């Protein structure tokens, strides 16, 4: 009986001209969004590759200079764009894509893509992800609002139940048929999208296919929950018009109201520190120590005395190496401890904000889906943090090599560490970023996936509880 009802609902859905038109519009929008994003990712990658090549040439051709001065000359490194950013751009437009690496400082990523955008960005950006998150649920609303309430109004519900059809079988049959209609619409589109992503060369986030599979599961849970909620509302609403009104209000609350309220809530309970306060505290810690009572000069003087004692010397000039280079190494080590503490604390705070927003998804499933989708696409904050840590490690490695060269080079011609040239610059490799494995993304996506699972389980449980109470009047 359930399969017979499902077959009828499936055929009725596809015979409905309104559904076909709405489905065509959604598919066109998804296709256009995917195509535009594909072109943008290609263009951005080309720009980054060209800029990286030019930056490498500038580094190699900077001329002869003191090796520590080369550390202040610095290099720019560029964040590679994940392949799945074609589908879900996540935070990419709002976090920096370029980091300047230099001695003594850990800089944050700069040059946000959103800074170059028009004022229209405030209304959101159409991507394939936002299409599935917002437009497909609206399509489900239009498909299901009259599934049960409409039959009640027309009097056909009484006739069906009088034939001995159990209310639960009727509800499950309709759910199966309407779900199949959506699957026939979305699965081929998803397959075409996956093939398009496969054609995008290079720059992949690790384990792209595993990430894509988990992303598919996340969206399936989300749409399954939406379908169950819509059918439950249609089952209890007195009229189809009432069901449509209720579902449109729920859609607007989920799509528009909940993200803003969740963001404001997270900001209220976990306020983001001001940039000027963060930098002031970090600079103070560099000069006075993390405890605020250990001045940098005192620490360096103690280090100098310990070095002399270690080598059995009484004067700096008697040391068998250039002490200025060793001081630079120690100065970097002390500063790095401060950077690790302050940036680690800041990043932990921002991740706590994200988790707060994700768990508020218990009242709006879109929040859980966005969190899981961005994490699996490699465009969330945890992936940005991973890149920032990799860039900082590259900075420390290249500054260490420069300072070691300075330490091993006698001072000459007024330079603290002699003069270095292209031979040294070529020893420093260009920055190469290795993205994290799928396990990293799955850990970041777990809270969102759990929220979606709870929503799907709760929605279908509610639908099964409502079904036996289905009445003709």
Each language-model region and where it sits:
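Selective transmembrane-helix segments that form parts of the transport pathway or gating/packing helices
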Residues: 22, 127, 135-136, 143, ...
């Amino acid at each position: 009986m359930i399969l017979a009802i499902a077959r009828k609902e499936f055929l009725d859905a596809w015979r409905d001209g309104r559904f076909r038109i709405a489905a065509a519009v959604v598919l066109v929008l998804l296709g256009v969004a995917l195509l535009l994003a594909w072109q943008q990712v290609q263009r951005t990658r080309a720009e980054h590759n060209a800029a990286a090549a030019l930056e490498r040439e500038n580094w190699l051709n900077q001329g002869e200079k003191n090796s520590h001065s080369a550390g202040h000359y610095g290099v720019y490194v560029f964040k590679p764009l994940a392949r799945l950013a074609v589908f879900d751009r996540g935070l990419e437009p709002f976090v920096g894509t370029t980091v300047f690496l230099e001695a003594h400082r850990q800089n944050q990523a700069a040059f946000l893509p959103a800074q170059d955008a028009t004022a229209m960005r405030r209304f959101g950006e159409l991507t394939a992800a936002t299409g599935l998150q917002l437009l497909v649920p609206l399509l489900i609303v239009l498909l299901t609002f009259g599934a049960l309430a409409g039959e009640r109004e027309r009097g056909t519900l009484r006739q069906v139940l009088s034939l001995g059809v159990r209310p639960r079988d009727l509800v499950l049959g309709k759910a199966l048929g309407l779900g199949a209609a959506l699957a026939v619409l979305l699965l081929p589109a998803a397959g075409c999208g996956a093939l398009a992503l496969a054609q995008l060369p290079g720059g992949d986030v690790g384990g792209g296919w595993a990430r894509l599979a988990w992303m598919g599961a996340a969206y399936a849970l989300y749409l399954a929950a939406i379908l169950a909620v819509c059918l439950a509302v249609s089952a209890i609403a007195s009229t189809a018009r009432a069901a449509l009104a209720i579902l449109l209000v729920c859609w607007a609350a989920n799509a528009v109201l909940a993200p803003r309220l969740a963001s404001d809530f997270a900001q209220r309970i976990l306020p983001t520190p001001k940039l000027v306060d963060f930098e002031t505290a970090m600079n103070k810690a560099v000069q006075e120590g993390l405890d605020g009572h250990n001045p940098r000069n005192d620490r360096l003087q103690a280090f100098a005395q310990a070095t002399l004692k270690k080598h059995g010397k009484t004067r700096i000039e008697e040391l068998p190496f250039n002490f200025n280079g060793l001081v630079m190494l120690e100065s970097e080590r002390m500063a790095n401890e401060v950077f690790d503490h302050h940036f680690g604390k800041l990043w932990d705070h921002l991740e706590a904000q994200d988790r707060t927003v994700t768990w508020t998804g218990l009242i709006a499933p879109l929040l859980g889906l966005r969190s899981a989708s961005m994490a699996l696409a490699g465009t969330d904050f945890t992936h940005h943090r991973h890149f920032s840590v990799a860039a900082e490690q590259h900075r420390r490695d290249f500054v260490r090599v420069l300072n070691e060269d300075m330490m091993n080079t006698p001072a000459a011609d007024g330079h603290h560490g002699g003069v270095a040239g292209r031979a040294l610059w070529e020893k420093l490799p260009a920055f190469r970023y290795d993205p994290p494995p799928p396990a990293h993304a799955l850990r970041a996506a777990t809270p969102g996936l759990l929220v979606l699972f709870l929503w799907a389980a709760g929605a279908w449980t509610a639908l099964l509880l409502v079904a036996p109470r289905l009445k003709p009047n």
